Amino acid sequence: MYVPTIENALVPVVVEQSSRGERSFDIFSRLLRERVIFLTGEVEDNMANLIVAQMLFLEAENPDKDIHLYINSPGGSVTAGMAIYDTMQFIKPDVVTYCMGQAASMGAFLLNAGAKGKRYCLENARVMIHQPLGGFRGQASDIEIHAREILFIKERLNRLMAEHSGQDYERVARDTDRDNFMTAQAAKEYGLVDEVLSKRP
């Protein structure tokens, strides 16, 4: 079970009574039973593997019921994020995305990748899109190889964002050239989300 980056001692425990006795769960495991997954903090390989595992588990439990992915992330690794993205597209259940707090960089990309019509932003959340970051040191030939790779990744991410947002590729390429911060309403107008929520629908 992926427990977001919160000190373990501070993670609440939920106790449930049943005819079989008493069971306790950490709050994130309990919410997973309700098909809720949290993507919080930096996107990195360990987090991505655990989120992918949770999505695959929930698909096996019920392939016809939505999965709810709550995002509060500054972004992070592109390859880790793409593992989550590809799984979201691969599995049968719709993945409903919610931005709470912030969805920046890869966080915004994953927010936008939710099921069409089921992408939400809470009204005071912030969304930020930009081009991928990279840095490399070494021989000139190696730097050239890595420069080609990051340009390929930039083009791929922009094409996918254009596809999910409904914007044309040229506008996405222009708008992601530098850090581009948006309110929840601006993210809706851009096509990154479908609705801004202040109350549960």
From Swiss-Prot:
Keyword Translocase annotated? no
Which reaction(s) does its UniProt entry say it catalyses? Hydrolysis of proteins to small peptides in the presence of ATP and magnesium. alpha-casein is the usual test substrate. In the absence of ATP, only oligopeptides shorter than five residues are hydrolyzed (such as succinyl-Leu-Tyr-|-NHMec, and Leu-Tyr-Leu-|-Tyr-Trp, in which cleavage of the -Tyr-|-Leu- and -Tyr-|-Trp bonds also occurs)
- Cellular component GO terms, alphabetical: cytoplasm; endopeptidase Clp complex
Q: Which domain of life is it from?
A: Bacteria
**Gene Ontology terms describing biological process:** protein quality control for misfolded or incompletely synthesized proteins
**Keywords noted in UniProt:** Cytoplasm, Hydrolase, Protease, Serine protease
Q: Where in the cell is it found?
A: Cytoplasm
The answer, when asked if Protease is one of the entry's keywords, is yes
List the EC numbers from the record. Answer: 3.4.21.92
InterPro entries with a match to the protein in the record: ClpP, ClpP/crotonase-like_dom_sf, ClpP/TepA, ClpP_His_AS, ClpP_Ser_AS
Q: How does it assemble?
A: Fourteen ClpP subunits assemble into 2 heptameric rings which stack back to back to give a disk-like structure with a central cavity, resembling the structure of eukaryotic proteasomes.
UniProt similarity note = Belongs to the peptidase S14 family.
Entry function: Cleaves peptides in various proteins in a process that requires ATP hydrolysis. Has a chymotrypsin-like activity. Plays a major role in the degradation of misfolded proteins.
User: What PANTHER family does the record tag this protein with?
Assistant: ATP-DEPENDENT CLP PROTEASE PROTEOLYTIC SUBUNIT (PTHR10381:SF70)
- The name of this protein is ATP-dependent Clp protease proteolytic subunit
User: What organism does the record attribute this protein to?
Assistant: Acinetobacter baylyi (strain ATCC 33305 / BD413 / ADP1)
